[in-house]
């Protein structure tokens, strides 16, 4: 099965208590062909330092912007993504183990669908 590339876009704004766990949930699920774009949307807490330290070690794209809000930040991430599929992950959420693999299976099984939808859980 050929791997389709996936971009994960993570907009970040003042989530120092959560963002490290978000990034950890991505780390072991992506392949080298995938892309992670972490956008610091003008955070005034330690979020910027946390993402810089973590994401640079992973070779992920880190972008600093003035605060524009979630919608514009997501759209900006979409505009610079270079893959077949884009996953918007909020910086206070985590990806369940196996999700990216399951996305790849669906992409292959349904011959590259235009969209993949799934649900989430609160915890």
Language-model features: locations:
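Nucleotide-sugar donor-binding/catalytic module of glycosyltransferases
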Residues: 1-123
């Amino acid at each position: 099965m050929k791997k389709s590339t996936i971009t994960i876009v993570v907009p970040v704004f003042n989530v120092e208590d959560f963002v490290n766990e978000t990034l950890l949930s991505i780390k072991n699920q992506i392949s080298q062909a995938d892309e992670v774009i972490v956008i610091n949307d003008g955070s005034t807490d330690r979020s910027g330092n946390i993402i810089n330290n973590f994401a640079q070690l992973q070779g992920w794209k880190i972008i600093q912007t003035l605060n524009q809000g979630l919608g514009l930040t997501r759209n900006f991430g979409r505009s610079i993504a270079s893959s077949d599929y884009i996953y918007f992950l909020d910086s206070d959420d985590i990806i369940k183990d196996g999700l990216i693999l399951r996305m790849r299976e669906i992409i292959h099984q349904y011959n590259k669908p235009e969209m993949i939808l799934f649900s989430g859980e609160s915890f």
